[in-house]
Amino acid sequence: MIEGMVARLAERQENEDRDNVDGWLRLARAYSVLDRKGEALAALGQAVEADPARADALSAYAEALQAAGESDPVSPRFALTMERILLVAPEHNQALWFLGAYARQTGDTGKARDYWRKLQARLPEDSEEYHSVGAALEGLDKAGKN
């Protein structure tokens, strides 16, 4: 019964309502409930394609990519999603962190440093996150001296 409802929703989204972001998000949730993670990820990708500036769709897509293992190491697709999130929400901590990681991973330590300094400036100095970012920045400095 549930499978049939999800199949009908998928058919409607694919054939009649491709620009309906909320429909794609509903379909992704339905696929997730059914433990069909690949199809959920594809539906979230369609939601982002339908409206690349929709923060909730971007965040859901980023979370799904992260769950699929695309955040360690950071995949180009995950980094692109984080860049899109920054366009909508320039102070998004998670996007700043992962874009710094991607920049470091691709050898652009200057860009990594910029992302992480911006992130660290937003965090309370007594927080664990602040110190984690500080350690990442120190790691960049040490790597640059070797």
Predicted stretch roles:
Residues 26, 60-61, 98, 132-136:
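Canonical tetratricopeptide repeat
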Residues 7-10, 14, 45, 83, ...:
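Alpha-solenoid helical repeat scaffolds
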Residues 104, 109-127, 138:
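TPR/TPR-like (Sel1-like) alpha-helical repeat modules
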Residues 21-33, 38-88:
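Alpha-helical adaptor scaffolds
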Residues 33, 67, 105, 136-143:
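Register position in tetratricopeptide repeats
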Residues 15-16, 50, 88-89, 122:
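Structural marker of alpha-solenoid helical repeat scaffolds
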Residues 1-34:
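Alpha-helical segment of the N-proximal tetratricopeptide repeat
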